[in-house]
Amino acid sequence: MTPTGTLYTVSAPSGAGKTSLVSALIDTTSNIMVSVSHTTRAKRPGEQEGVNYHFVSHEQFATMVENNAFLEHAQVFTNFYGTSKQWVEDTLAKGIDVILEIDWQGAQQVRKLIPAAKSVFILPPSRECLRERLTGRGQDDESVIDARMAEAKSEISHYVEAQYLIVNDDFDTALTEFRSIVVANRLALEKQQDKHQSLLESLLS
């Protein structure tokens, strides 16, 4: 019998390295996928439909909300983002783990709907390092970086709501810790019982 997959919410302040860690974990670990969110924002250069996001209109998004199609959804400035409930449920049923890259508010919504979900929070090693990373992107001016630093403090204040905490100082160490969380959950009794049901029955017969 194939055990159901585990749902992970991964949250972090902007610049903590969440997306890079999730990408590296997906590339080096079998049977785990990252959920592709629906969004109303415009597609940026280099982004692909169904890879980075599912791009929809405000009207389409509103209809999906009315139809209860989202596991969680949120408004960020003038745009909306949401996680497809059906896709997550179907993927977990196949025994594949799913990662949701969402903020603390989204993680709260998910935990209410799926209490078995595991929450991971990623921290930068210091405020100075976080600012250096944001500055190093070369995407924003100082006023935007100041705003992101203020947002980071608010996001970090919710770390206590997570079950697992990773400090992304050394990337390889953080990745190993992240992978260890996934492996440990796969070795949990209820998962192993489902996976090795026939073996256990034969050993006890």
UniProtKB/Swiss-Prot annotation:
Principal EC category: transferase
Keywords: ATP-binding, Cytoplasm, Kinase, Nucleotide-binding, Transferase
Segment forming the signal sequence: none
InterPro entries per record: GK/Ca_channel_bsu, Guanylate_kin-like_dom, Guanylate_kinase, Guanylate_kinase_CS, P-loop_NTPase
SMART domains (alphabetical): GuKc
Residues annotated to bind ATP: A12, P13, S14, G15, A16, G17, K18, T19
Chemical reaction(s) catalysed: GMP + ATP = GDP + ADP
Residue ranges that the Swiss-Prot or TrEMBL entry lists as coiled coil: none
4Fe-4S recorded as keyword: no
Sequence intervals crossing the membrane: none
Keyword Cell inner membrane included in the entry's annotation: no
UniProt GO cellular component terms: cytosol
GO molecular function, one term: guanylate kinase activity
Domain of life from the UniProt record: Bacteria
Main location per the UniProt record: cytoplasm
Pfam families assigned to the protein according to its UniProt record, in alphabetical order: Guanylate_kin
CDD domains, A to Z: GMPK
Annotated EC: 2.7.4.8
Residue span(s) of domain Guanylate kinase-like: 5-183
Subcellular location field: Cytoplasm
NCBIfam families: guanyl_kin (TIGR03263)
The protein's role, per its UniProt record: Essential for recycling GMP and indirectly, cGMP.
Record family assignment: Belongs to the guanylate kinase family.
PANTHER family linked to this entry: GUANYLATE KINASE, GUANYLATE KINASE-RELATED
Name the UniProt record assigns to this protein: Guanylate kinase
Lineage start: Bacteria, Pseudomonadati, Pseudomonadota, Gammaproteobacteria, Cellvibrionales
